Amino acid sequence: MIKDPLGAVKSTFAEEVNRVLRDLGSATRFSPIQVSRVRKDYASYGLPVGFKVAKDLNLDPERAAKTVLDRIDMSRIAYSSDAYAESGYLNLRIDKARFFRDILKLASSEELGRGERKGVVGMVEHTSANPVHPLHVGSGRNAVIGDSFSRILNFLGWDVRRHYLVNDCNLQVAILAAGRSKVRDLIPKGKVDHWFGLIYAISNAFLEIWRIKNGFNSESKIEEWSEVVERIGRMEPELLRIGELSEEEVMSLLREYQRKEGGSVQMFREITESVLRGFVETLERMGITYDSFDRESELIWDGWVDRAIEKLESSGYLKREGKAAYVDLWEAAKGDENVRKVFELSEDDISKLEREGKLGEVIPRKFYLTRSDGTWLYTGTDVAYSLYKFDGLGVSFCYNVIASEQNMEQKGVRACLALMGHDPGKLIHLSYEMVNLVGAAMSGRRGLYITLDEVLDEAKRRVEAILKERGIYDEEICEKVAIGALKYGLISVSPNKVVQFRWERVLNLEENSGPFIQYAYTRALNIIKKAQGVPEDFDPNELKSDAEITIVQMISEFPERVWSAFNLMRPDIIASYANELASQFNKFYEDHPVLSAARPEERAARLNLVNAVKGTLGLAMDLIGIPRLERM
């Protein structure tokens, strides 16, 4: 059975029209995306054939459409019944009964739109938060987007590996390690990532105070950082023992660890593994898991950074300033077509920008990979990681889910990948904006943030209060509704827009929320349970009201929405679809008795419709990671 009946209608209709146009000598071609439903006719789909080919055929639009119609072979078009020309359009009428039956059967079995396995392995790298403080709500958005996009790819037929890059070799971890080295005797309290977050914040504050005193930081005042020290000191007085940290103290630890020397290895690993355990606990609570945690340190120790440097040196665009290595992206863009593609510029564009003195606004000239002391920057290890993904793991493509503030750095990484001989188009930046938790200010360096754990706990408390008001309380239900609410709140906005996170919207049980969708799914499930089964045999022609037909049409569009979410890198499209379908189903249920339908034939058809809604909503929920509930 075709797993996307509507897609089959559109593609075969466009293909057949194109075949006829070739025979008629017209160069005009149509794509499936141009096939649209004829207004007020649920069973007809049209193409503006007459208007597009009138000039080619030297006919008026009406006559051109009829000329094409006369040559159409209906047997080549999926689900076709007949066709007709009207007002310059060529319209296809489908076999409603067969089309509706297949749609409902596929949706009920949760096979609608599911892709055949492609035998192609891809990767989605997401979350990859620095292991220095607890995950905050912005990291949560990254995780939810990355997890959902992985699910979409898998549903469409790709074999997807979910990876997390553990950034254990950066300056932030070195600051945390320097602070921890002063209080090695202290045993972590509470959730371990929260505890290390306090050490990081106070250690960073002590370092900033040292920088100000020694003339390395003129933008901050000692009082600002002293307030951070005092605030955290009131929470954990023992951490005041850390005291001032110097730049050299921190950088010495970082150099040691990157070189795998001294006692730093054990301490860095203890810290990062501990924080990572806290991350995993939070993310698994949200139903988010990974296939691999790749460590930045091992990219250095196992030689991947050296391989990357060798390849970049071979390209001729790697330059050095003492121990600092960088790629000259201006020269690379002038000399390498694939680098120009990364920045979406032609040779003429680059020449023009250079003449106008504006090239630096579009391409940073020096893309540094190491610091002046030779330690690796995150850009250097990111370049090495990209090489490892393709040469080490052998993936065919990789999506990096990284915040929009890293747009230029990601272009630099992709440009380096091109210079190392790989297609930069295979490394895709899935960019997203941040989360504004209305009424809260956040700064990890100052220890001011709303953790993902806190948001989850608050969501659960609020759900408990709402459900208790309704005379319902169940621990598992509260947890799953809270998770659904949070995840929908983070994913229902297009990645290129800032999320304005408001509790009143996130927990709205009436519309446009995770709980609203969960409730609609549970309602459909319970109808099926009460019916004690769904009749295998039913007459699709019994579904004739506008509400019933609208639902079938919406269900038929599910595969199209999934492909749109993939092509546009927008999981929010599926979230919006789930909300629309839930809303339409609720309207249907208000006016259409199912279990008490007037006739057995009507009851059978409506039960199949409800079962299809359940299956489609369930698939949509799975793709955006919202838990299914059997009761609510």
From Swiss-Prot:
**Which terms does the record give in the GO molecular function aspect?**
arginine-tRNA ligase activity; ATP binding
Which PANTHER family is this protein grouped with?
A: ARGININE--TRNA LIGASE, CYTOPLASMIC, ARGINYL-TRNA SYNTHETASE
Q: Which keywords annotate this record? A: Aminoacyl-tRNA synthetase, ATP-binding, Cytoplasm, Ligase, Nucleotide-binding, Protein biosynthesis
* EC main group: ligase
List, in alphabetical order, the GO biological process terms annotated in this UniProt record.
Answer: arginyl-tRNA aminoacylation
Record organism:
Korarchaeum cryptofilum (strain OPF8)
Q: What is its EC number?
A: 6.1.1.19
The Gene Ontology CC terms held by the record are: cytoplasm
**InterPro entries reported in the protein's UniProt record:** Arg-tRNA-ligase (IPR001278), Arg-tRNA-synth_N_sf (IPR036695), ArgRS_core (IPR035684), DALR_anticod-bd (IPR008909), Rossmann-like_a/b/a_fold (IPR014729), tRNAsynth_Ia_anticodon-bd (IPR009080)
Highest rank taxon of the organism: Archaea
- Write the protein's name: Arginine--tRNA ligase
Q: Catalyses which reaction?
A: tRNA(Arg) + L-arginine + ATP = L-arginyl-tRNA(Arg) + AMP + diphosphate
List the SMART domains hit by this protein, alphabetically.
Answer: DALR_1
Motif 'HIGH' region: residue span? 129-139
Which SUPFAM superfamilies does UniProt cross-reference here? Anticodon-binding domain of a subclass of class I aminoacyl-tRNA synthetases, Nucleotidylyl transferase
- Which gene is this protein's source? argS
To which protein family does this belong? Belongs to the class-I aminoacyl-tRNA synthetase family.
Location(s), subcellular: Cytoplasm
Any Pfam family matching the protein = tRNA-synt_1d
| Principal subcellular localisation of the protein | cytoplasm
